[in-house]
Each structure stands twice: as C-alpha cells, then as structure tokens.
Swiss-Prot record:
<keyword id="KW-0285">Flavoprotein</keyword>
<dbReference type="InterPro" id="IPR047001">
    <property type="entry name" value="MnmG_C_subdom"/>
</dbReference>
<keyword id="KW-0274">FAD</keyword>
<feature type="binding site">
    <location>
        <begin position="14"/>
        <end position="19"/>
    </location>
    <ligand>
        <name>FAD</name>
    </ligand>
</feature>
<comment type="similarity">
    <text>Belongs to the MnmG family.</text>
</comment>
<dbReference type="Pfam" id="PF21680">
    <property type="entry name" value="GIDA_C_1st"/>
</dbReference>
<dbReference type="GO" id="GO:0050660">
    <property type="term" value="F:flavin adenine dinucleotide binding"/>
</dbReference>
<keyword id="KW-0520">NAD</keyword>
<protein>
    <recommendedName>
        <fullName>tRNA uridine 5-carboxymethylaminomethyl modification enzyme MnmG</fullName>
    </recommendedName>
</protein>
<dbReference type="InterPro" id="IPR040131">
    <property type="entry name" value="MnmG_N"/>
</dbReference>
<dbReference type="InterPro" id="IPR004416">
    <property type="entry name" value="MnmG"/>
</dbReference>
<dbReference type="GO" id="GO:0002098">
    <property type="term" value="P:tRNA wobble uridine modification"/>
</dbReference>
<comment type="function">
    <text>NAD-binding protein involved in the addition of a carboxymethylaminomethyl (cmnm) group at the wobble position (U34) of certain tRNAs, forming tRNA-cmnm(5)s(2)U34.</text>
</comment>
<feature type="binding site">
    <location>
        <begin position="273"/>
        <end position="287"/>
    </location>
    <ligand>
        <name>NAD(+)</name>
    </ligand>
</feature>
<keyword id="KW-0963">Cytoplasm</keyword>
<dbReference type="InterPro" id="IPR020595">
    <property type="entry name" value="MnmG-rel_CS"/>
</dbReference>
<dbReference type="InterPro" id="IPR044920">
    <property type="entry name" value="MnmG_C_subdom_sf"/>
</dbReference>
Amino acid sequence: MKYLAGDFDVVVIGAGHAGCEAALASARMGCKTLICTMNLDSIALMACNPNIGGTAKGHLVREIDALGGEMGINIDHTFIQSRMLNTSKGPAVHSLRAQADKKRYSERMKHLLEKEENVVLRQLEVIEIDVEDNEVKGVLTKNGAYFTTKAIILCTGTYLKGKIIIGDIIYSSGPSGLYPANDLSQSLLNLGINLRRFKTGTPARINKRSVDFSKMIEQPGDEKIVPFSFIHNKLDKDQISCYLTYTSEETHKIIHENIHRSPLYNGSIEGVGPRYCPSIEDKIVRFPDKDKHQIFIEPEGENTEELYVGGMSSSLPEDVQIKMYRSVPGLENAEILRTAYAIEYDCIDPQQLDLTLEFKNINGLYGAGQFNGSSGYEEAAAQGLIAGINAVLKIKEKNPLILKRSDAYIGVLIDDLVTKGTNEPYRMMTSRAEYRLLLRQDNADLRLTELGYKVGLVKEDRYNKFLNRKKNVENEIERLRNMQITGKREINEFLLEKGSTELKKPISLYELIKRPELDYFKVEPLDDKRPSLSDDEKEEINIIAKYEGYINKQLEQVEQFKKYEDRLIPKSINYLDIKGLRLEAIQKLEKIKPINIGQASRISGVSPADISVLLIYMERKDREN
C-alpha cells in the first residue's frame, strides 16, 4: 500500500560511482538528499576492473577532485598500487592510474554517505517516477513508500532489466549476482523516454594460490606515489604488484573451436557492446593476425586472494572458459572463483538530455553514468557530479554549470554524449579532446577549482590551498621571466655539460628552460634564489614554460574553431587519403558523407580531434589548388 514516506530536495536512484558523487554534491551544496540503492553492500561497487584512472580517465578523476568531488580522495585512501602512465610521451597524455582495494573503496564511500549531514541512505527499489505537467513530483518504491522531491537523478548503472549471459545460460540479474531493477524501465517508457539495450562484460576472478607468477612479468607500482587529489601532498604505502602475461596459440585455438557457442556470435546477445573494451573472443575474431594478446593479473584488495584477469572478459560457456583461462601461461592450474559473464541492460539515448544532464522534456529529471550510455567508473562519477551540481543550482534558481570542451574532459564527455549521442558504450579517450594540451591532469585545479568554489562544493580551506598553489606558480613564472642569465664562463661550461649551446647574449631563465635539452629541474644550479615549492608546483611551472608556444596555439584554436561550423566538404574527398584520421572516423564519414564540417562534427564516432585533422587536410588542399 502506498504511503507518504518523506520529502526531499533531491532523490538519487542508484549508489554506484555516479550516484555517490551526485548525492554528495547535492548534500554538500545544502540540499536534503535521499539516495536509494538495491543493496547497501554494493555502494560504489567495482563490478569490473579494480582500478581508478588510466589514460584520459585519470584526467576525469583529477577534474572531479578539482570541482570538489570525492572519487580522487577515496582512491587515495584505498589504493594498493599507483602508476603514472604514458610518461614517455608529452604531458597532455600523462595519466594517473591506481589499483584499488575494491572492498575498502566501497566501504569508505558508504561510510561517507552515512555520515553526510544532508544525506539519507536507504536500501530500496524505486519502481516509478511520478511526473505531472512535465515536472517531477516524486518516486514510488516497491515497498509502497512515496517520496516527494524537486529533482531526481537516475544513476541506474547496469541494473535496469539486467540480464546475465554465460554461453547459453541467460538469467535476470544485476552485476555481481545482485538483484536487477526490472520495473523502473516501464515507468520511464511511460514517460516517453527512449530506451535501448547496451552490453558490457567482465572477466573471471581467480584464486591467487593457483597462479604461477614465475611465468609472468611483474609490474610493480611507481616508487614515487602521485596522489589523485590536490588536497594530498604526499602518499606513502607498501604497494602490491600486478603481473603481465599473454594469450597462447592454444587459447586462440580453444576460442576458434567454440566460437559457435559464443552468445556474441550466435545471436543471444542483442545489446551493443563497448568498442574499446572487447571480449577476448571478439578480439581474436576481429584481429586474426595477432598471435597473442596482453593479459593483466590484478589484485582485488589486501585482504582477499581474488585476482582480476584483465583483458580477458568473456561470455563463453563456463566449460570453455575453464579451458581457455588455463591455456594462458601462468594460469595452467587456475581456480576460477567467479565466472566471466556478459550483462545486458537498459539505458537511454543521451540526446534526450541537455548539457546540464537534465531531460529536455521533463523538468527536474536528470541522468548520469551508464544510464546515459557511457562506460567506466570515472565517466559515471563525472556525470553524477555535474548532474548533482545542476540539480541543486536549478532548485536554488541559479545559472547551471556547463563545462565547455575547452574547459575540461568532463565538458568533452558530456558534449559528446548529448550533442552527438552514442550507439555503443562511450569511453573517454585523450584523442576525443581537441584541446588536450590545455586539459592536462596536472592543471585540473587551475582550470576548475574556482568553479567548484563558486557553486559551493569547494570549501574555504581547500580554496585557500588552491589560491596559494596558484600564486606560487604565477609568482615563480614571473620571477623566471625577470631573471637574466649572462654568458659567464661557469654558466657556459654548465650549459655545454648539459649538451646545450653557449650564451652569446643575456637571456631570461624562463627562455633558457625552453631549450629541448634543459628544463626547470636541470637549471637549478644556475638559480640561487629559487623558492621552496612542492613537487607538483615545480612540475606545473616546468610544463607551462616548456610548452608555452603550443599552449598559446591551442588557446587561439579555441577561438578559431567556431568559424568552421559551416565549412563545406568537397564531394570528391577521399577520407582514406587523410593521415591521422582514426579508422572509426573514416568508416563513419565514408558512410554518412556529411556536406559540411558542422554535420561531420555531430556524427557519433567522429571526434573533434578528427575534425581538426580534416580541417588541416582541407586547408592544405585549398593551398595546393
């Protein structure tokens, strides 16, 4: 029987990575917030890989942190290994990645919600969204509880009509054996919301005692641990290693012999899977020329023997899986603790949302995370944060927070989802950001903390720390610009030792740092007035000095790009001739044949980076003609 159970400013449905950020943002901005979850023990659950960050995803975590979100702080408290990726490349693609103790990560996030003053946390299933005159009024639960509210944020993850698939075994379920949410989808359809089916998958978990690590390559954490959160100066921890192995010829043979039993290829799976995270059987079919694929063996925590077999997700039958996993060097005697599976679920076409993540046709209804067609914990958390912020700003009748593509990876993520839509689970990549040298992970606070402070998420002590860092960086750059270095004998000897050339005339230390063979750290012996700075401040100063020309060029591009919206594309263009275009972009452009740059830029799978490549090609052709 239906009964009135309470009144809230904001109701968040789902307590995964999107839901947690949405609820914490809403509560910390002063709104009374209800967060509902199917199971209190699955809050911030890492249903797939036990890590946070990675290429482009690390940028998102830093941006979440800079705006006042929780993910970066939580992983800093619960990581078991930390690595900075892509260090051999430029700073635009440096990405922090941390292995998580997945249970502690979940427990700490749950405890935060329990302690948060404006949060009420409940284990219950929402089955209906109540809307009158295109405006949300409340939610109804399976137990009959009705909660009135001004805003609802849907963060349902993979639970909506979730269906687990292992070979020919198919059953209704959420991730990791949890209950699915089978009733809410119909309520959304009744509201005129378009739903679709997506699919994702996860590999098996195996027992550590059954693994022969001597046949694998050890991957320890970095000696110097870099925090995700800007509030942490230094982290120390005994880290746990991951291990690298590869599929074998036998692995590929087993998969080929049983491919007819794969739900991916026999029609059992209807949902669209993630292009950039394919199952092992999909990889072997799609890349027949590759004789081996990387497999990462990753610990799931400090107090468990479970290991995650990264790179080997599958929906093959269990008997095939056992043979397949045991064909991998080091896994010959692997004990499978949890079988790999695929999961299908309902989600929306995100083009039904506007850039605030509110539904265009329903006031007060927001979507975030996998519900919006994205994949990944970090993408979900970023959307949850923005949806939570904007729900509160609307309640308070303030202007929304809309991040542009030139502001943040979060801006790229949301613009791609909302403007272009997606026909497959969307994953953030550095190649999707056309201004990635401006959107580095090291400067996320300089880009976004001011905004976080203005909306009320970044508190005074955090803001003062940010202002101090900003001032230190600006003052040091100014000092370097004004400090003149002359061609004294000892200075020229120092430069020659470093493989640089002698000075013929005075030069600022700032300009000297720009030389390819030098940097801010190497010129320290020439700088007796150098102030005491933190490691991250020094790194920031070095990047700004070294890449100033490129950074200024991208700032100009931000303004210039607007001019090309209506630029016509020649009918005779051959996209295969354009170096730098990704294969996916070539396929989509060839198929749709857009008539102008504006149309091309809105095609799903064609990134703004691809558009930049296309424009450069067209301009070169114009000059040649």
